[in-house]
UniProtKB/Swiss-Prot annotation:
Classification via InterPro entries: aa-tRNA-synth_I_cd-bd (IPR045462), aa-tRNA-synth_I_codon-bd_sub2 (IPR020751), aa_tRNA-synth_I_cd-bd_sf (IPR008925), Glu-tRNA-ligase_bac/mito (IPR004527), Glu-tRNA-synth_I_codon-bd_sub1 (IPR020752), Glu/Gln-tRNA-synth (IPR000924), Glu/Gln-tRNA-synth_Ib_cat-dom (IPR020058), Glu_tRNA_lig_a-bdl (IPR020061)
Subcellular location(s) of the protein: Cytoplasm
Membership in a protein family: Belongs to the class-I aminoacyl-tRNA synthetase family. Glutamate--tRNA ligase type 1 subfamily.
Highest classification ranks of the organism: Bacteria, Bacillati, Actinomycetota, Actinomycetes, Mycobacteriales
Reaction catalyzed: tRNA(Glu) + L-glutamate + ATP = L-glutamyl-tRNA(Glu) + AMP + diphosphate
Region (Disordered): 111-134
Name listed for the protein in its UniProt record: Glutamate--tRNA ligase
Superkingdom per UniProt: Bacteria
Gene (UniProt): gltX
Record note on quaternary structure: Monomer.
Length: 491
């Protein structure tokens, strides 16, 4: 390797919705680049016209922006190796194909899959072994005969006759024995370059020094090593990058996490109200960690500590409960004003709040729930009693059945009488009045004393602290709701 600058790339295909495995790959590449003072290159592999979509491309951009994984080169940023969309680089790829053919590193192959199978059968081999290198040494006359038949050749790389070994940054020394990987196709029969060619060619032309990717791509590495050897001989590549293969992310049971699993969908987590810091922290733990007793950390802490050699090669299991717990910790770590702003934006985006809200009331209310939620979507059930139109306020039937029975009548009567006399409508005064009336004078235990008041005022048996909630709600609305609840109670 002849370059001292670390250059890594994240090169997703724009198909479907971004999933957590993809994001983990982006995160580890980003952290590796930042830790080493290198460059994080974002490249789009959009060469599958049947599956690629502009919607998916925009979703990937949206995901990276939301997570704060900024790229140094790539779409919308530019850089010295433009363009960064693979579909716009075909002339570069075809030029490399031509050079490989001219140098004898690659050759045209005319065999059909059926012919390959028949040759295997005739030789007593498994017919599913794959390509048998038959076309390696066709004579010019044989080639011309196939062309005269109208056959369209694919171009194949001539694999070397030596073992292909690399020191994997995650798995250690890995070897594919000579002869285990057949000559592989670089183009389709119509001449269009395949992923097997374009991915390493773009890495070589963009001077990528380290390739960190999922373990599912491990089997493609010997092909890419062979292609790099050939590209160095023809002057296209200056060096072969280091490879590291990240462990599988598993779902429930012993299955690999699938795109069909809801927890794999990045935007489902965002819509539930994960904060980027929480999700990135949890994804970092899928194969890596700072230490056993340091599960919660910031992105800056991750960058400072990140060591690719410490990534565990064993499969990592996605645990939604652990992810939620990590997110809850990050919510608690936010400055109150930052948390309030994020929660306000989230509840507005999801249609719970309008554009006009008493921001002072909201900021105070947000601080009351910051330590009580796991994801941002949890907050609305706790706060909606403060922001719904009074005509839409309703008490949860289950909470009413449990807490607003006939025995709540004297509690509500005493609460109303004591609150009517309160002069300063603040949490301390409300607490003093209600404790005196309900605990001291009625002799009730706190749960029996305050549950009917809480349900009457907030509509639920679960809410932010009662006295602070009533202070925010105000005297008129609080008393009106208590009177309405009392009117619905027999006795």
């Amino acid at each position: 390797m002849t370059t001292s600058e670390v250059r890594v790339r994240f090169c997703p295909s724009p198909t479907g919705t971004p999933h957590v495995g993809l994001v983990r790959t982006a995160l580890f590449n980003w952290a590796f680049a930042r830790h080493n003072g290198g460059s994080f290159v974002f490249r789009i592999e959009d060469t599958d016209a049947a599956r690629d979509s502009e919607e998916s491309y925009q979703a990937i951009l949206d995901a990276l922006r939301w997570l704060g994984l900024n790229w140094d080169e790539g779409p919308e940023v530019g850089g010295p190796y433009e363009p960064y969309r693979q579909s716009q680089r075909r002339d570069l790829h075809l030029d490399v194909v031509a050079k490989l053919l001219a140098a004898g590193e690659a050759y045209e192959s005319f065999s059909t899959p059926e012919e390959v199978e028949e040759r295997h059968k005739a030789a007593g081999r498994d017919p599913k072994l794959g390509y048998d290198n038959f076309d390696r040494d066709l004579t010019p006359d044989q080639r011309q005969a196939f062309l005269d038949e109208g056959r369209k050749p694919v171009v194949r790389l001539r694999m070397p006759d030596h073992d292909l070994t690399w020191d994997d940054l995650v798995r250690g020394e890995t070897t594919f024995k000579a002869g285990t990987v057949p000559d592989f196709a670089l183009t389709r029969g119509n001449g269009i370059p395949l992923y097997t060619l374009v991915n390493p060619v773009d890495d070589a032309l963009m001077k990528i020094t380290h390739v960190l990717r999922g373990e599912d791509l491990l089997s493609s590495t010997p092909r890419q090593l062979a292609l790099y050897e050939a590209m160095q001989r023809i002057g296209v590549a200056d060096f072969t990058p280091r490879f590291g293969h990240l462990p599988f992310v598993m779902g429930q049971g012993n299955k690999k996490l699938s795109k069909r699993d809801p927890e794999s969908n990045l935007f489902i987590h965002r819509d539930r109200g994960f904060v980027p810091e929480g999700l990135l922290n949890y994804l970092a733990l899928l194969g890596w960690g700072i230490s056993d007793d340091h599960d919660v950390f910031s992105l800056d802490e991750m960058v400072a500590a990140f060591d690719i050699s410490k990534v565990n090669s064993n499969p990592a299991r996605f645990d939604q409960k652990k992810a939620d717990a990590i997110n809850a910790e990050h919510i608690r770590l936010l400055e109150p004003a930052d948390f309030a702003a994020r929660l306000r934006a989230f509840l507005t985006l999801h249609g719970h709040l309008g554009e006009t809200v008493d921001e002072s009331v909201f900021a105070t209310a947000a601080e009351l729930v910051q330590t009580r939620i796991v994801v941002l979507s949890d907050a609305w059930d706790l706060l909606k009693f403060l922001f719904v139109d009074e005509a839409d306020f309703a008490i949860d039937p289950a909470a009413a059945a449990k807490n607003l029975g006939a025995d709540s009548a004297p509690v509500l009567d005493a609460a109303l009488a004591s609150l009517d006399a309160v002069e300063a409508w603040d949490a301390a005064s409300l607490e003093e009045a209600l404790k005196t009336a309900l605990v001291d004078e009625l002799g009730l235990k706190p749960r029996k004393a305050f549950a009917p008041v809480r349900v009457a005022v907030t509509g639920s048996h679960i809410s932010p602290p009662l006295y602070e909630s009533m202070e925010l709600l105000g005297r008129d609305v609080s008393l009106s709701r208590l009177r309405s609840a009392r009117a619905g109670v027999a006795g």
